Amino acid sequence: MQLLVSPSSIDEARHSLAADIIDVKKPSEGSLGANYPWVIREVKAFSDKPVSAAIGDFDYKPGGAALTAYGAACAGADYIKIGLTFEGKEKARAVISAVVKAVKDEFPEKFVVIAAYSDHQRMGSISPFDMAPVAADEGADFVMVDTGIKDRQSTFAFMNEDTLRTFTRTNTKLGLKTALAGAFTFEDIDALKRINPEIIGVRGMVCGGDRNATVREDLIKTALAMIR
């Protein structure tokens, strides 16, 4: 299980180098808010760790999603991550297919991560269980669960441990890897280890409990020690 940490600035990224994966995003623009391409480039330049880039919480806009994904890949991101804020498997298929093609045609070595939301019912968006088979069909590498509305409620408030374990095992059978995120705390780590996704994504946990505070290197090291 790898630890992905989401700094919100270049300065924070410099304090996140202990993480397994550095995730460039802009929390002020949403759960998977996109940061600037020059931030991705600079983080990639000084880090020897894989870099992930969130490209946004997308409504049904396949063209916009494809172009944004391509931009993140060109800027140097190793993982390109998009959230789907709409309902419907066929609409999801169109967006996922476009994003995978935009990235993989030129950068087959890069990873495409498709996110749905644990709180999809209140978001009015596609369920993670409905999204995952579509992502597998269209050639994505990872599927992810995160909270869409950031009100300090955890993914565990919407999907319990058994549900997340089933999700992770189902993804493995589909040939997908799993990333889990969504207001996790240090107290959640034992459950996450039992679920055993490939990646857990955190921000608030390593900011002292407030995702709008600053990433702390000491808390990243604490989290790493706990998940190993």
Predicted ranges, named:
Residues 10, 30-46:
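Glycine-rich, positively charged N-terminal anion/phosphate-binding segment
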Residues 1-3:
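Extreme N-terminal starter segment of soluble prokaryotic enzymes
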Residues 50-52, 56-67, 75-156, 170-174:
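Conserved anion-binding
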Residues 20-33, 74-89, 142-152, 195-219:
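Glycine-rich phosphate-binding active-site loops on the catalytic face of alpha/beta enzymes
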Residues 40-43, 68, 99, 131, ...:
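Aromatic/hydrophobic pocket-lining residues that form π-stacking "cages" and hydrophobic walls in ligand
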Residues 8-18, 53-75, 122-134, 180, ...:
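Catalytic cores of alpha/beta
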Residues 150-211, 217:
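Hydrophobic secondary-structure block in the mid-to-C-terminal portion of proteins
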